[in-house]
Amino acid sequence: MDELFPLIFPAEPAQASGPYVEIIEQPKQRGMRFRYKCEGRSAGSIPGERSTDTTKTHPTIKINGYTGPGTVRISLVTKDPPHRPHPHELVGKDCRDGFYEAELCPDRCIHSFQNLGIQCVKKRDLEQAISQRIQTNNNPFQVPIEEQRGDYDLNAVRLCFQVTVRDPSGRPLRLPPVLSHPIFDNRAPNTAELKICRVNRNSGSCLGGDEIFLLCDKVQKEDIEVYFTGPGWEARGSFSQADVHRQVAIVFRTPPYADPSLQAPVRVSMQLRRPSDRELSEPMEFQYLPDTDDRHRIEEKRKRTYETFKSIMKKSPFSGPTDPRPPPRRIAVPSRSSASVPKPAPQPYPFTSSLSTINYDEFPTMVFPSGQISQASALAPAPPQVLPQAPAPAPAPAMVSALAQAPAPVPVLAPGPPQAVAPPAPKPTQAGEGTLSEALLQLQFDDEDLGALLGNSTDPAVFTDLASVDNSEFQQLLNQGIPVAPHTTEPMLMEYPEAITRLVTGAQRPPDPAPAPLGAPGLPNGLLSGDEDFSSIADMDFSALLSQISS
């Protein structure tokens, strides 16, 4: 029994009798990138495992049981045993041939190394780097040369500390080499540091199945998983390799919580985990919520307070106006007249019922020559009028002589469908008497224009005074057909040139002819003879008639 006791309860290892080396600050395993020599920049400094953004630390060793002079060599070896010399190199101050070597300070036993960087080599330079390690005797564990050939993990290295001190007799004494934790290249996804950068949501139902988008640093789609841990519970998110987008994004669904009937939110940890080396990222908080059987949040939408409902009703287009309608905006319009002077009201012009009341002394003597009057009357356009069929007086002798002197061919119109004759226009009332009179009285001429019209002639034989004009005849012309006496006939269109001719020549008006019978042929104006008969007024050629008048 006494012989088995040491086997069951082994004794504590005895402390070394001499000095030994201890690593009190390990190098940071992840987060550092190995630099190529062709990059032309410093490889950086290897940080310590407790290094932060505000407090920087570096790999540190302590020589226990010894204080005095000594040397230290730091080299790179492979991660897995046998720990062969690594083709990568250490660069920095006091570095040569791929390793670091310097004298130790005799006054202290703790030594820190701040200027150490890792420089990687290309695969094509791998054999040359291994041969250089053999030539410089950089082989801390004395691995045979035959075993140094083979594959190397270029994404992970270890630091090997070799310390040489002096024994009491002054001879050099090599202490056993010490290896650090592996240091991984942050550029390689299979060894890089795992880090969750961002998620689109950090809570979900306790039943699971919520889709989450996760952004991260480079990962390998075949060597990554989303790990959930809680008190006495762990689970993994559900996704496939196709859900890993370009090694930096993962779309997964949350696993169900251990207790699907929980009544209060539960906080758990969510991490990235690499199964190959069981490396974990920094945890991120995730919250499981109780299941309310309301996946579409209908109950939450129904929770409307009175004030909320009231505000909604105020904004509703179907609700009545709550505030009185604002008064319309008044726009200032500039007035054309002065505000101080009132605008005079329009006054009707007092027209007289007869020309006998006109003071002729107010008007200058004006008589038109016969040539200009006939030419002006021919050029003045007149609207076509429908002439009623009524007995007309015989043509004036002056007009008949004018027509005989300049005969014009009358075109014969082709027979056409008879057109309806418009009914006779109603006679104007007394109120319309002043229309033409006002137009005549308002005529204004300049001296030059009037002189050009009259031909600048003052011969009394040519011009006749207006005093010799018969007022009754002029009144009949202005009234446009209103008879002065009941026994006089209604004047027609052709009486105007006749009256003007009489004004120019000074001749008296001939007596009115006897009224023609109702069945008498010819037009009412008396221009056509008895043998010229038209079945309708539409058969008459007005253009030929006007050309005769103008000639």
UniProtKB/Swiss-Prot annotation:
Keywords attached to this Swiss-Prot or TrEMBL record, sorted alphabetically, are: Acetylation, Activator, Chromosomal rearrangement, Cytoplasm, Disease variant, DNA-binding, Host-virus interaction, Isopeptide bond, Methylation, Nucleus, Phosphoprotein, S-nitrosylation, Transcription, Transcription regulation, Ubl conjugation
Sites of Cysteine persulfide modification: C38
- Glycyl lysine isopeptide (Lys-Gly) (interchain with G-Cter in SUMO3) cross-link, chain position(s): K37, K122, K123
The N-acetylmethionine modification is found at: M1
Q: Where is this motif: 9aaTAD?
A: 536-544
Q: Where is this region: Disordered?
A: 309-348, 506-530
Where S-nitrosocysteine occurs, the residues are C38
Q: Which residues carry this modification: Phosphothreonine?
A: T254, T435, T505
* Assembly and oligomerization: Component of the NF-kappa-B p65-p50 complex. Component of the NF-kappa-B p65-c-Rel complex. Homodimer; component of the NF-kappa-B p65-p65 complex. Component of the NF-kappa-B p65-p52 complex. May interact with ETHE1. Binds TLE5 and TLE1. Interacts with TP53BP2. Binds to and is phosphorylated by the activated form of either RPS6KA4 or RPS6KA5. Interacts with ING4 and this interaction may be indirect. Interacts with CARM1, USP48 and UNC5CL. Interacts with IRAK1BP1. Interacts with NFKBID. Interacts with NFKBIA. Interacts with GSK3B. Interacts with NFKBIB. Interacts with NFKBIE. (Microbial infection) Interacts with human respiratory syncytial virus (HRSV) protein M2-1.
- Protein name (database record): Transcription factor p65
Instruction: Name the species this protein comes from.
Output: Homo sapiens
Q: What lineage does the source organism belong to?
A: Eukaryota, Metazoa, Chordata, Craniata, Vertebrata
